[in-house]
């Protein structure tokens, strides 16, 4: 996700294409809502599976989508190229394939995505590894700070600076690789990302 944000930063900065800005904002919002831990830093990762099934939290059954979306289904299926066979083990990973939509269609898709997000949030989430790793947090915070500048997003900038200050407090005496239950001595990567 961090490298994807960095790539979107570059695409938007070079092209000023609002499509890239939207994808950038969606990804940053996902990271900020799903990866923050109790220390107001970022956890490490999510497991791939929930309820013992790989990808279950993120994939959609064709019939489930059709029943959930009703009359909104056809446009959504067109945008995400949904099939009964699916694109991952009989289910559909929502991969955008059609982005030439009218303003009204974009608005409808946006509302539909919110419905599905609410529906997905009712599912059992994958296990979250909430430990804060220095290298990962430094890399992410640097990338988010750049995103705030590229998109001129003052809220993102202030939230990122707040997280940087929190991380600085943890690093003030000694740099560790990760914090929480146990402190693990730093690796070279931790020093490199902290210095950048």
Q: Over which residues does each language-model region extend?
A:
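Glycan-recognition and catalytic cores of secretory/periplasmic carbohydrate-active enzymes
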Residues: 1-196
């Amino acid at each position: 996700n961090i490298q994807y944000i960095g790539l979107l930063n570059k695409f938007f900065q070079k092209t000023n294409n609002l499509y890239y800005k939207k994808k950038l904002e969606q990804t940053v919002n996902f990271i900020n809502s799903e990866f923050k831990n109790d220390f107001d830093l970022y956890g490490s990762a999510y497991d791939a599976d929930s309820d013992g099934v790989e990808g279950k939290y993120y994939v959609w059954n064709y019939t489930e989508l059709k029943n959930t979306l009703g009359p909104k289904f056809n446009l959504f299926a067109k945008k995400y190229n949904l099939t009964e066979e699916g694109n991952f083990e009989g289910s559909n990973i929502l991969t955008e394939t059609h982005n030439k939509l009218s303003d009204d269609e974009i608005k409808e898709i946006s509302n539909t995505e919110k419905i599905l997000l609410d529906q997905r949030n009712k599912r059992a989430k994958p296990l979250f590894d909430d430990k804060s790793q220095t290298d990962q947090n430094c890399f992410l915070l640097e990338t988010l700070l750049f995103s705030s500048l590229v998109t001129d997003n003052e809220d993102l900038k202030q939230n990122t600076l707040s997280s940087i200050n929190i991380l600085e407090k943890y690093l003030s005496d000694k740099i560790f690789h990760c914090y929480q239950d146990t402190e693990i001595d730093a690796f070279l990567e931790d020093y490199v990302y902290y210095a950048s």
